[in-house]
Amino acid sequence: MPSDDSTLPQPVLLVEEGLELRQIELADAEEMFMVVDANRGHLREWLPWLDGTNSIEDEVSFIGTTLEEYGRGDGALYAIRLDGDLVGAMSLNWIDWGNRGCGVGYWLSTEHTGRGIATRCCVRLMEHCFDDLGLHRFVLEAATENFPSRAIAERLGMRLEAITKDREWLYDHYVDSALYAITEPEWRSRD
């Protein structure tokens, strides 16, 4: 659990004018499902959960689970909103308060990839994790062949720590994973 002087991620993290990370709510379920459904082919390439998200009810259930995790201090899920529209999601998939570490995950709709949105949102979430939550280590894990996500980690100055064999089952095959991390002192000393 968080210490008394830290708080879980705030409900809204302003990234820049018009771009924000907004804590997901049950009221977002329909919009989230519509974006997921419209981008199913694109997202399926790297995300293993698409076959379990086939209705708004599935999305409601997923959001309910993430809100429970948030309440326990175990994680957080944000809608990535650009000019008010939901264009993707970013999450703290896990928070280890004892070791002061966390892991990030994200996805964007097809038309919003390649514009630096995920990178800028990661920077804002890292700032919050290090500055406000007092975390020490920030982890990003991506399939070894997911070059766009790996490039984000590298742009952020994260260190490649491991390649893990057969890390994740992706519908009909295993994929290897690249594990990147950066510590708070490394983050502060970059550039």
Predicted regions and their residues:
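Residue-level detector of secondary-structure transition/capping positions
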Residues: 37-40, 51, 67
